[in-house]
Amino acid sequence: MKYQVLLYYKYTTIEDPEAFAKEHLAFCKSLNLKGRILVATEGINGTLSGTVEETEKYMEAMQADERFKDTFFKIDPAEEMAFRKMFVRPRSELVALNLEEDVDPLETTGKYLEPAEFKEALLDEDTVVIDARNDYEYDLGHFRGAVRPDIRSFRELPQWIRENKEKFMDKKIVTYCTGGIRCEKFSGWLLKEGFEDVAQLHGGIANYGKNPETRGELWDGKMYVFDDRISVEINHVDKKVIGKDWFDGTPCERYINCANPECNRQILTSEENEHKHLGGCSLECSQHPANRYVKKHNLTEAEVAERLALLEAVEV
């Protein structure tokens, strides 16, 4: 394929994130790359797309910088660009865990498990595997038997763990996320919270799916990604669809954002049901005056009224 998507992070010291972000944006644009990079004093977190040649040049330049020389790049072949624009933004932290006291992964983090070791942990009855992603990511795809925290954002995870601490306190804990960066801090936080045996999947789900030993086995569904692809295949052994349509519960792997801009909830649904519900996740959202689906498809007032009448009749 002509294009590649890079997923990477590196905890290191960047003295002036704002100046670095400005320079790095210019560098990325010089290579015609598109994507999103976050920069903080604690390091860098990015996902980029470009031609094979351009992304290879980017990785070479990063590896030549002492701060990023051993960065682990997860590489996905792609048929087209996965992003439309290029952003490099300074932040106070790379991932937000909403902690009273921050965790430095360079000092405290869980043991790294390579894909084959992680697969063994999945099969171990004495190990609890916790998905460190958001609920909508889990619902599209996850490892078999993994715990699904009831959270809409990563910053809600510590509170959820505290509320359910008695279920996991005396267990071996293994965490996983998309590329590994969330687990660096989350696993370190677990150790600080008193959990004694904590490990994490090295390189995240993205690495597990490409590993020649595991080939994504024991993963069900697809992996949610934060770019135009929306999702990617992980299991190359025995693929299974687990996503369910928001409206009728049928198998589904198609994500949309609710058409109500004030809601924006991500839901799995078919084109038929999206059409039927005017892109809304609820009757209230379908009725919203700023409904983006209505605007995008240039629906007339009569067409909108007709569909809403059908939905309202079902609600009654």
Swiss-Prot record:
<dbReference type="Pfam" id="PF00581">
    <property type="entry name" value="Rhodanese"/>
</dbReference>
<dbReference type="InterPro" id="IPR001763">
    <property type="entry name" value="Rhodanese-like_dom"/>
</dbReference>
<dbReference type="InterPro" id="IPR020936">
    <property type="entry name" value="TrhO"/>
</dbReference>
<dbReference type="Pfam" id="PF12368">
    <property type="entry name" value="Rhodanese_C"/>
</dbReference>
<feature type="domain" description="Rhodanese">
    <location>
        <begin position="123"/>
        <end position="217"/>
    </location>
</feature>
<dbReference type="InterPro" id="IPR040503">
    <property type="entry name" value="TRHO_N"/>
</dbReference>
<feature type="active site" description="Cysteine persulfide intermediate">
    <location>
        <position position="177"/>
    </location>
</feature>
<keyword id="KW-0560">Oxidoreductase</keyword>
<dbReference type="Pfam" id="PF17773">
    <property type="entry name" value="UPF0176_N"/>
</dbReference>
<protein>
    <recommendedName>
        <fullName>tRNA uridine(34) hydroxylase</fullName>
        <ecNumber>1.14.-.-</ecNumber>
    </recommendedName>
</protein>
<keyword id="KW-0819">tRNA processing</keyword>
<dbReference type="InterPro" id="IPR036873">
    <property type="entry name" value="Rhodanese-like_dom_sf"/>
</dbReference>
<comment type="similarity">
    <text>Belongs to the TrhO family.</text>
</comment>
<dbReference type="GO" id="GO:0006400">
    <property type="term" value="P:tRNA modification"/>
</dbReference>
<comment type="function">
    <text>Catalyzes oxygen-dependent 5-hydroxyuridine (ho5U) modification at position 34 in tRNAs.</text>
</comment>
<dbReference type="GO" id="GO:0016705">
    <property type="term" value="F:oxidoreductase activity, acting on paired donors, with incorporation or reduction of molecular oxygen"/>
</dbReference>
<dbReference type="InterPro" id="IPR022111">
    <property type="entry name" value="Rhodanese_C"/>
</dbReference>
